[in-house]
Design a protein with these regions (language model features):
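Short hydrophobic beta-strand element within catalytic cores of glycosyltransferases
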Residues: 184-187
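Carbohydrate-associated surface elements
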Residues: 44, 65
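A short, well-ordered alpha-helix in the C-terminal region of glycosyltransferases
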Residues: 135, 220, 227-241
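Conserved acidic donor-binding segment of nucleotide-sugar-dependent glycosyltransferases
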Residues: 199-212, 220-225
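A conserved mid-protein helix/loop that constitutes part of the nucleotide-sugar donor-binding site
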Residues: 85, 89-108, 114, 118, ...
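Aromatic "clamp/platform" in nucleotide-sugar-dependent glycosyltransferases that forms part
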Residues: 148, 167
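Membrane-proximal helix-turn-helix segments that form the acceptor-binding/catalytic region
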Residues: 21-38
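Nucleotide-activated donor-binding/catalytic signature segment of Leloir-type glycosyltransferases, i.e.
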Residues: 131-147
Length: 255
């Protein structure tokens, strides 16, 4: 017969965006319990979900499909020039991604005498708000909204550091992609990146979800470029966890 599957891509405990579609948590839980399997993109996403719903349904973790070979090929399609130490961020310009936080962090850097570039790749409903914020904080020379790019990998590869400052992530595709490209990474402590980068910052540096923590984490790399090389090496090792064939077999096994 037909199997019913539900795929959970986000930390619903901290970012319960589905709430408005149900009368109550009890009704939402009931829907999940009608499924044959509930699939999660990370162990942490699953644990947070169970904190919220504690369903009795069969649950499984299958990482998002990450094709490192293709990502590396695409990253080499063309080159972009950078002028100075460059931090790259990629994502939709929406509240969950907290790009306003990185703009405030950029201001702290400028106030402390640093001259670094921040590239924000992506489009979304907050574009004009963020653009105004950059202008109001006199950061037009340091923070650049690059808009939607069909090939963001080129920008990630070219930058010195990749940063994710999200409020909530289930897996964080873009952090995984940055690992494939062997980038030094700083991320806020959301469930996906904690799992990908290691809870003790083994493969990338984790920061608390506030401007000062993010500033201090990025500053580690700006002040000591050797740290960039160290974490590039760690990222390349970590990217070996992504295996297309293994992930596809896991998906086929539940269909």
């Amino acid at each position: 017969g037909i199997r019913h599957l539900s795929w959970v891509h986000v930390d619903l405990f901290n970012f319960h965006w589905t709430k408005r579609y149900f009368k109550s948590n009890k009704h939402e839980k009931k829907c999940y319990e009608l499924m044959d399997d509930v699939i999660f993109v990370s162990n942490d996403a699953k644990n947070k979900f169970q904190q919220l719903f504690n369903v009795t349904t069969s649950t499984k973790v299958i990482y998002n499909l990450i094709d490192c070979k293709t990502i590396v090929l695409r990253a080499n399609e063309f080159k972009v020039e950078k002028r100075k130490f460059t931090v790259c961020l990629v994502g939709r310009l929406v509240r969950q991604k907290q790009f306003d936080s990185i703009i405030r962090v950029a201001r702290i850097f400028v106030d402390n005498g640093y001259d670094i570039d921040f590239w924000i790749v992506g489009a979304g409903c907050l574009e004009s708000d963020l653009s105004k914020m950059i202008h109001d904080l006199h950061l037009d020379d340091n923070v650049h909204l690059l808009g939607y790019k069909p090939n963001p990998y080129v920008y990630i590869k070219c930058a010195d550091l990749f940063v994710s400052c999200s409020l909530a992530e289930g897996f964080s595709l873009v952090v995984a992609e940055a690992l494939c490209l062997g980038k030094a990474i700083v991320s806020t402590k959301t469930v996906g990146p904690v799992e990908l980068l290691g809870s003790n910052s083994e493969y990338g540096v984790l920061a608390d979800n506030d401007d000062e923590s993010l500033y201090n984490a990025i500053k580690l790399f700006v002040n000591d470029y050797n740290k960039v090389f160290v974490y590039q090496d760690k990222a390349a090792k970590r990217s070996l966890m992504f295996d297309v064939e293994k992930t596809m077999n896991e998906i086929y096994s539940i269909l």
